Amino acid sequence: NFTKPTENKPALLTFNEVETFLHEFGHSLHGMFANSTYESLSGTNVYWDFVELPSQIMENFAIEKDFLNTFARHYQTGENLPEELMKRMVDAANFNAAYACLRQVSFGLLDMAWYTRHTPFEGDVKEYEQKAWAKAQILPVVKDACMSTQFSHIFSGGYSAGYYSYKWAEVLDADAFSLFKQKGIFNRDVAGSFRQNILSKGGTEHPMTLYKRFRGQEPTIDALLIRNGIKN
């Protein structure tokens, strides 16, 4: 579904299309580099909150100057994408990043509040959800607003007790990519380790075991906060 060519222009990718291509390419690598005996444990057949690591880590390359300079050129002049434009793209992506982060965290808290109950719920839904996400609430509550009654992700969309995985995937991909940033985004040793310890293993071992084998530690939130401009 990428932008089609016209009579006067070739097919030119938007920034979002580049991100989408890299994302889906990451899923493809997860399948192509799979090296397990059983299909049920191969490639993307992993824990639900681990499946997006190979795809989302690839998206990080989309804002790396050294990567963009390999292909992102003006289709007529051959001029590289200006560094100032790259910076503006990153700044735009990070606009209100802290608020967006809290929004996702609040949805995760609400999801867990519903699915960690041990008794049927009887009471005011609005009051219940306001208590659930109180830890992430920074703006005044909108009167009569009720997220639970329209939260299709957790009631009919397959994310019940798993909405947290959206933000967790960001923590994983940012922390993992920080190793590429430290060693060089084209470092073959780091890439080889990611292939061997993450991509080839599928679901044959616990995700955290595989992650620590690649990263040398458990993930922290620091890399995500730095990437989003929330922390220096």
Regions flagged by a language model, labelled:
Residues 1-232:
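Cation-handling catalytic/transport regions enriched in His/Asp/Glu
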